[in-house]
């Protein structure tokens, strides 16, 4: 089984914020692949289904971002899922809005959700970095906790990620990125 983790903060007040773009992708994948309704488990909202030929558990930690690692550790430990079979979808202020990059391992670039996951399971999991841009002025935390100006474009990108997710899960990272870029340009 694969573990697909969408990072975000719980609560309606954070629903449309840049920091919750991982939740948007997780919800979109769950809908697009007809996963059952999310249930509370492992300090998270969890749903298990299939993404193409891949059995997958989608996890949305119910803790705040800086404690996401606890939920990931619980789910991964219970199902004996190694870090290499975990993919985390998260906001990245170092990328322009709408840019998507994928990598395995590496540093957390100051992202508290990734820092928490690194401390819990190590850093060899996959990361799908979802660009939210940096503010021209003001604090970064204020920026990522503010709402998107164009939430429709975020939802469109989430659907493109979902539509091409089997490429990524099949190990074709370049094909996945190529399709996202091509689709996103249209």
UniProtKB/Swiss-Prot annotation:
Keywords on record: Cytoplasm, Hydrolase, RNA-binding, tRNA-binding
EC number(s) from the headed UniProt entry: 3.1.1.29
GO BP annotation list: protein quality control for misfolded or incompletely synthesized proteins; rescue of stalled ribosome
GO CC aspect terms: cytoplasm
Alphabetical list of CDD domains matching this protein: PTH
GO molecular function: peptidyl-tRNA hydrolase activity; tRNA binding
Subcellular location: Cytoplasm
Chain positions recorded as tRNA binding sites: 14, 64, 66, 112
Residues of the site described as Stabilizes the basic form of H active site to accept a proton: 91
Classification via InterPro entries: Pept_tRNA_hydro, Pept_tRNA_hydro_CS, Pept_tRNA_hydro_sf
RNA-binding found in the keyword field: yes
Enzymatic reactions: an N-acyl-L-alpha-aminoacyl-tRNA + H2O = an N-acyl-L-amino acid + a tRNA + H(+)
Principal cellular location given in the protein's record: cytoplasm
S-S bridge residues: none
Marked site: Discriminates between blocked and unblocked aminoacyl-tRNA: 9
Active-site residues per Swiss-Prot or TrEMBL entry: 19
Function as written in the Swiss-Prot or TrEMBL entry: Hydrolyzes ribosome-free peptidyl-tRNAs (with 1 or more amino acids incorporated), which drop off the ribosome during protein synthesis, or as a result of ribosome stalling.
Record's subunit section: Monomer.
HAMAP family from the UniProt entry: Pept_tRNA_hydro_bact
Family from the record: Belongs to the PTH family.
NCBIfam families cross-referenced by the UniProt entry: pth
UniProt-recorded name of the protein: Peptidyl-tRNA hydrolase
Organism: Anaplasma marginale (strain Florida)
